[in-house]
Amino acid sequence: MKLDKQVWILAGGRLLLQFGTGFTLFYAPLFFVNQLGFSPTMVGIALGSASISGIVGRFLGGSWSDSPSWGRKKVLLLSAAISCLADVFLAGTYDYNTLLIGNLLMGLGIGFYWPPAEAMVADLTTRDQRNFAFALSRLGDSIGLGFGVAFGGVLIAVTGSYRLLFVIDGISFLVFYAIIYGAISDSGQKVLEKQTFWQGWGKTVKDYNLWIFCVVNVMFTTYVMQIQTTLPLYFTNFAVNPDDFTITRISSLFSLHIAFAAVFQLPIVKVINRLTHIQGLILSFLFWGVGFILIWWAGNSPDFAFLIAILAVLISAIALATYNPTASGFIVDLAPPSLRGIYFAINSQCWAIGNLIGPPLGGFVLDSGASYAHNFWLFSSASVFCGILILFILQNNINDGELTIDN
């Protein structure tokens, strides 16, 4: 499919950005808990604190992305600069206050990133191109993250230095800044309208369908955070057969998870293009439900636990690959072009809320003991039926014409 070259450049930039993130994402909880001695709950709170500043970043980033005086590009540059500063603090963490400051800054930087990044893809594509374009962006995320996790595991094995991972992450943000500065023009100038800061938000908050969607979106993002932050500690500390889950194996497992997401990201577009956005999200929920059951099985199995875990991350990767372009495409259909930044800000606020809920929830469950840790995955699997019910309600609202989607 022929796309604007800037879409490809953005995908390449995201690959680089996620390569740096992969160095830290799965190893940060292990570093802070097992080497610095913080409890899982304390680390969960610190990681979750990024969501507080992330809410501020998304709120401002969405509005500024829709402002002719700011635009998408300037907000992306601000995001990269703040995120690089965050890694300076995280690389130098020895006490809990520094850990909190680093995570608050990282949350702010990432908060600024998502609204303009997603809005740019929408600006540069047609409706027929968007599922593929959003999938391509997520493919860049997955490939970069996968290589980052893999090389991070090798780097830890060779050097034993977790702090070096944060240094490399900071360098990736600097390179990303250079790419955006030199190779990307501001895509939103043709569609942006002059309006006060609050006018755009006033129009957006009246979209009832958007708020219904946000409920299920928070569920999805909480699921993702359980895979990213809770699962490494669960397999490390609670698996019935801990020999199957060494640090090297966990590194390989999560590299496979991201590799699976990359492999299936573009092929899954052929499936979701035949479905409505609601149907695509229901399909994702079903995959998540199966994946959580397999995680429970892997944690409780005395034999073949690692093989079951591979199957679990395969299914959860397909769930993620199904969710990402479908959710972004649904937001584009809801949003007027001049308000895409704000709509994507609200969409990405769901990630902030998921980040706020997910790590502390997972940390609390793991602190509560083995039985709670094991059963948590079964409760997570059962929760998908609540999400599917909400999606049926949303579909009925659309079918009844209570609110229309601008195609």
Each language-model region and where it sits:
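Structural signature of the two symmetry-related core transmembrane helices
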Residues: 74-88, 279-294
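Helix-loop boundary and gating motifs at the non-cytosolic
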Residues: 2-51, 211-212, 216, 220-244, ...
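Conserved MFS/SLC helix-loop-helix module at the cytosolic interface between two early adjacent transmembrane helices
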Residues: 57-92
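Juxtamembrane intracellular "pre-TM" segments in multi-pass secondary transporters
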Residues: 1-4, 185-215, 406
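Helix-to-loop junctions at the C-terminal end of transmembrane segments
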Residues: 57-70, 264-277, 366
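Cytoplasmic helix-loop-helix junction between adjacent transmembrane helices
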Residues: 104-141
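C-terminal membrane-cytosol helix-exit motif in multi-pass small-molecule transporters
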Residues: 171-189, 390-395
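A membrane-interface helix-boundary motif in multi-pass transporters
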Residues: 157-171, 366-384
